UniProtKB/Swiss-Prot annotation:
PROSITE patterns listed in its UniProt record: HYDROPHOBIN
Signal peptide positions (record): 1-17
Gene name of this polypeptide: Hydph7
Taxonomic source organism: Pleurotus ostreatus (strain PC15) (Oyster mushroom)
GO molecular function: structural constituent of cell wall
Nucleotide-binding recorded as keyword: no
Subunit structure: Self-assembles to form functional amyloid fibrils called rodlets. Self-assembly into fibrillar rodlets occurs spontaneously at hydrophobic:hydrophilic interfaces and the rodlets further associate laterally to form amphipathic monolayers.
SMART domains registered for this protein in UniProt: HYDRO
Task of the protein: Aerial growth, conidiation, and dispersal of filamentous fungi in the environment rely upon a capability of their secreting small amphipathic proteins called hydrophobins (HPBs) with low sequence identity. Class I can self-assemble into an outermost layer of rodlet bundles on aerial cell surfaces, conferring cellular hydrophobicity that supports fungal growth, development and dispersal; whereas Class II form highly ordered films at water-air interfaces through intermolecular interactions but contribute nothing to the rodlet structure.
Pfam families: Hydrophobin
Keyword terms of this UniProt record: Cell wall, Disulfide bond, Secreted, Signal
Chief location of this protein within or outside the cell: secreted
Protein name: Class I hydrophobin 7
The keyword Phosphoprotein appears for this protein: no
Subcellular location: Secreted; Secreted, Cell wall
Amino acid sequence: MFAQSFIITALAALAVASPLQVRTSDKCNTGTVHCCNSMKKSDSADISKIASLLQLDVKGVVGDVGLQCSPLVSLVGGGSKCSGQTVCCDQTKFNGLVNIGCSPINVGL
């Protein structure tokens, strides 16, 4: 009886001591992972104005448009840091000023 109680107690302690980690991939099926300061719908008036000024064609874009984006690079031992929205984008224009075809993702929950 003592051995059975000991095993049950040990397993319970092990379960409590093990941290639960839920991780999602920080990779995209297509495109690249970026951190964007702002996200807009591709058919919004703001994006229409920006696209016109930059001569970008956003008609038929699947996904949102990210503004002021930078590539999300994993930090050694610390994961990735993003104070904006983490997204997966199909196209990067003007060094990340505008990213096209973006969809939100979760990184390192």
